[in-house]
Amino acid sequence: KEPNQWTALSKLIDSLNPNQIALNTSKDYGHADGLHLTEFNELKNAMTPSQFNKIVSAEKLGVAWLETRTAKEMAIFPTLLAISHQIIKEGFSNRVIQPNKTSTNDLVWWFRQKVSDLGLSTWFHPSVEIQRRVSNEKDAIIRPGDLLHVDFGISYLRLNSDVQEHAYVLLPNETTAPTELVSAFSKTNRLQDIL
């Protein structure tokens, strides 16, 4: 009946007289901050001052909604994570990485291609970083002795994985990662279990 959507909304709010009007805004969570400034200004201009004073952030509702999963989604999620870990395992293998030749960018695009080949999509652009004993070597070529870190996520049926893993590239004379590295990761994993 009312041709202007903002005026119609103001009339609806007036008729319902809610105690609060929750908007999709958040200073802390981007996922709960989807209201555009233009929309906010249009809404503000259409509202009465008493209506406008009832505005609150719907941040908690938005985050809770994103955290909510159905039983079917919860049944699928372990498979999604398993696929994510399997892709990373293959990506970090010597079938994909040739030390002194493969770059981190090569590996990033290998991850994207692998996901595409599986008919899936990435949730965000994967990243692969190198940590080195010798800090002045800044090139992106993966070398023996490098510690690799990947941040990787895939999407399937509205679910997203977000997985971070590390891999150590063995030196020619090594058969396992250095004891101090294994110990550091063991302590880190213990802390994760506690938290």
Segments the model singles out, each with a brief description of its role:
Residues K1-L195:
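Active-site neighborhoods and metal-handling regions in enzymes and metal-associated proteins
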